[in-house]
A protein has these predicted regions:
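An N-terminal RHG(E/S)-centered segment typical of histidine phosphatases
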Residues: 1-37, 48-51, 55-59, 74-81, ...
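Phosphate-handling substructures
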Residues: 14, 55-118, 181, 195-197
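Alpha-helical packing segments of well-folded alpha/beta enzyme cores
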Residues: 22, 26, 46, 112-120
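Glycine-rich phosphate-binding loop signature in dinucleotide/nucleotide-binding domains
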Residues: 31-34, 123-130
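Short glycine-rich phosphate-binding loop at a beta-alpha junction
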Residues: 35-42, 131-135
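Active-site signature of alpha/beta-hydrolase-fold catalytic machinery across serine-
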Residues: 52, 143-147
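Domain-level recognition of soluble alpha/beta enzyme cores
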Residues: 152-176
């Protein structure tokens, strides 16, 4: 679905063989990193990712539906061209970046954003000194980035981390104020040695 640039949302698909190889490399790398909890979206593709990681790190996987990708309703399974042809009014709303537009049978960007940030604050920001690894989707990572960088929800997506990459955000006191900061974004060094298939 990613390779075809389809709006996947809550629809599911298994990892490809390339995806499994990437996640295996990620698991090997995360084995050397200390963290307390492993939390995943409850969708199959992220649960599969988290299960592979857990084979290397030994963590129990906690599934949280609030880490799901945005619910794209009638758009799920379609690419931009198909959306433009089949749902021209919805397409026009999407390109305006209106965070309060409700996709038919789906949700608004603002609803998705708030559920994602709730998880971030609860799992990773709730207890001082706690480190959590969150296995999530591109839209969720985009919302985390927006939250930390204080970007308006109308701002177009400006970061596209690679699949199976590592992004680290930290909650703490920096320069005298308590806040989230981005330490690393989209680090995919562990994927550089993979042979292409």
């Amino acid at each position: 679905w990613n390779m075809e640039e389809r709006f996947q949302g809550h629809q599911d698909s298994p990892l490809t063989e390339t995806g499994r190889r990437q996640v295996t490399a990620l698991g090997r790398r995360l084995k050397a990193m200390a963290f307390d909890r492993l939390i995943s979206s409850d969708l199959g593709r992220t649960r599969e990712t988290a299960a592979i990681i857990a084979q290397y790190t030994g963590h129990t996987v906690h599934a949280d539906r609030r880490l799901r990708e945005r619910h794209y309703g009638v758009l799920e399974g379609l690419n931009a061209k198909e959306i433009h042809e089949q749902h021209p009014g919805v397409y026009q709303e999407l390109i305006t970046e209106n965070p309060d537009y409700v996709i038919p049978e789906g949700q608004t960007h603002r609803q998705h954003y708030h559920q994602n940030i709730e998880v971030l604050n609860e799992w990773a920001g709730g207890t001082p000194g706690t480190t959590a690894a969150l296995v999530a989707h591109g839209g969720v990572l985009d919302n985390f980035f927006r939250h930390v960088a204080h970007l308006d929800l109308r701002h177009p997506r400006c970061v596209l981390p690679a699949n199976a990459s590592i992004s680290i955000i930290q909650h703490g006191t920096f320069y005298g104020s308590l806040r989230w900061v981005i330490k690393t974004w989209g680090d995919a060094a562990h994927l550089e040695t993979l042979e292409p298939h």
